[in-house]
């Protein structure tokens, strides 16, 4: 029906999954996706802030680039949510992605392809940099020493497709969905 067609269109617009063939529509979809991503990141940060744990440092959108506290030789993007646990001596860098839920096998394959070809290489590069530059995190938590470790979590709102496929390239990135941290936010430190 016309109503159902309209509702599908609205859903695709709000999810940022509508087919975009014009520059204006591409810009609109990009803005929708950026807004969704920012809101998701802020909500993950709030989840950890609301725990009110004195030993847990929480920050978001922490840039890794020349001239910033996490000073790197080149622009490496940002850590969406940075958690530093003083008790377990862990630095957890969360890459938060609010992908639309995959409903078909084709969408699962497409999501996996997007993660592998567009997202993961940047996350791995950032993870390697963070592991090699633990001392730079002292800007945020001065107590950081050589006993601290770093891990990166690729967090998606819905369960993501990546873990259901075999991949040629091994990496240290941990893949979680929000359901796994809402039940137990400290899951990221296990």
Report the location of each language-model feature:
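Intrinsically disordered, low-complexity Ser/Thr/Pro/Gly-rich regulatory segments
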Residues: 1-190
């Amino acid at each position: 029906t016309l109503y159902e067609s309209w509702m599908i269109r609205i859903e695709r617009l709000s999810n940022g999954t509508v087919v975009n063939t014009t520059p204006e529509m591409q810009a609109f979809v990009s803005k929708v996706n950026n807004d969704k991503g920012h809101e998701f990141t802020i909500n993950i940060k709030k989840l950890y802030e609301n725990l009110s744990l004195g030993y847990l440092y929480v920050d978001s959108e922490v840039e890794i680039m020349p001239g910033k506290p996490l000073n790197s030789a080149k622009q490496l993007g940002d850590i969406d949510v940075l958690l530093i646990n003083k008790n377990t001596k862990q630095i957890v860098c969360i890459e938060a992605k609010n992908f639309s839920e995959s409903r078909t096998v084709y969408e699962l394959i497409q999501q996996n392809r997007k993660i592998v070809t567009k997202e993961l290489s940047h996350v791995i590069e950032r993870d390697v940099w963070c592991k090699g530059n633990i001392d730079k995190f002292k800007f945020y938590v001065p107590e950081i020493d050589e006993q601290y470790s770093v891990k990166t979590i690729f967090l998606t709102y819905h369960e993501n497709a990546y873990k259901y496929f075999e991949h040629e390239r091994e990496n240290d990135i941990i893949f979680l969905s929000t359901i796994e941290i809402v039940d137990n936010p400290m899951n990221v430190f296990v």
